Amino acid sequence: MFRAIPFTATVHPYAITAPRLVVKMSAIATKNTRVESLEVKPPAHPTYDLKEVMQLALSEDAGNLGDVTCKATIPLDMESDAHFLAKEDGIVAGIALAEMIFAEVDPSLKVEWYVNDGDKVHKGLKFGKVQGNAYNIVIAERVVLNFMQRMSGIATLTKEMADAAHPAYILETRKTAPGLRLVDKWAVLIGGGKNHRMGLFDMVMIKDNHISAAGGVGKALKSVDQYLEQNKLQIGVEVETRTIEEVREVLEYASQTKTSLTRIMLDNMVVPLSNGDIDVSMLKEAVELINGRFDTEASGNVTLETVHKIGQTGVTYISSGALTHSVKALDISLKIDTELALEVGRRTKRA
């Protein structure tokens, strides 16, 4: 059972006062039977270990002394129930991760859910219960809620945008919380979106800085094609375009050269108008010009209010950094059964 810090940790060499414990991140793929059975699994990553991210979150909360408040107020042998309560409407996400955290803190805790990841919850709904040692439930509480509230907020916004964007697919970006890339992108999947590239390693994405450094769109594409051929890499290639002229340049290159290009980003071709509406005529022209030869991705000025109109242009994907970089957490709480706690407290003369 979890008490202070049951994790492999090292004392930071420059700590002057109380030692700060640092958990080293592992480059081992997560192996978890609960994950393998999930309907919506976390996206794959070659160096990201989900278990160690959970351990890091617990370790930073526990510090070097553990939960001093729990030690002072909760009997170590106290058993209780605690209920998950939705305090606003939304899409719940992070249920599977919450189970893993509870199991990491105390494998004897029993967790029961009345909904699944991706289900709609309404304000006032009790949607889950955890039973067992009250001390360990409270230790896990904040870490569980931090993950669930953030993931549920992402899933809720993703669901709204994915529904509005249809028939286009909604994507997130790499604008995620540091260290939580996989968790954020997992929440997008739970909300009904699709994942963009995980990082710098799994897709070539030629953006404005690459184009400027290479000397133009055509030269950048040629360099990428040569690099992939020389290194025998087969991965997706996307190029950013900002004007119709750049779209034409990409299409001209592709018509004359065998290329690995798979997707064209149409960046900031959605123009905001003074009346609050948007002009999508440039985006629509670009999509018609490409004419299905490559997948297309609209980026820039994408909001919940604009995404439907963008989705009607025929674009394949719509990407939005707002799904993860400025998400509003869904308000969820975990409350111990007061009557049961008081009854136990009376028996132990602590109430």
UniProtKB/Swiss-Prot annotation:
Family as reported in the entry's similarity comment: Belongs to the NadC/ModD family.
EC number: 2.4.2.19
Species of provenance: Nicotiana glauca (Glaucous tobacco)
Keywords: Alkaloid metabolism, Glycosyltransferase, Mitochondrion, Pyridine nucleotide biosynthesis, Transferase, Transit peptide
Role according to the record: Involved in the biosynthesis of pyridine alkaloid natural products, leading mainly to the production of anabasine, anatabine, nicotine and nornicotine, effective deterrents against herbivores with antiparasitic and pesticide properties (neurotoxins); nornicotine serves as the precursor in the synthesis of the carcinogen compound N'-nitrosonornicotine (NNN). Involved in the catabolism of quinolinic acid (QA).
Catalytic activity of the protein: nicotinate beta-D-ribonucleotide + CO2 + diphosphate = quinolinate + 5-phospho-alpha-D-ribose 1-diphosphate + 2 H(+)
Entry-linked SUPFAM superfamilies: Nicotinate/Quinolinate PRTase C-terminal domain-like, Nicotinate/Quinolinate PRTase N-terminal domain-like
Name of the gene this protein is made from: QPT2
Name this protein carries in UniProt: Quinolinate phosphoribosyltransferase [decarboxylating] 2, mitochondrial
GO molecular function: nicotinate-nucleotide diphosphorylase (carboxylating) activity
Cellular component per GO, a single term: mitochondrion
Coiled coil: none
GO aspect biological process, one term: nicotine biosynthetic process
Sequence positions that bind substrate: 142, 173-175, 197, 207, 240, 267, 299-301, 320-322
Main location: mitochondrion
Subcellular location: Mitochondrion
Family matches, as Gene3D superfamilies: Aldolase class I (3.20.20.70), Quinolinate phosphoribosyl transferase, N-terminal domain (3.90.1170.20)
Pathway membership: Alkaloid biosynthesis; nicotine biosynthesis; Cofactor biosynthesis; NAD(+) biosynthesis; nicotinate D-ribonucleotide from quinolinate: step 1/1
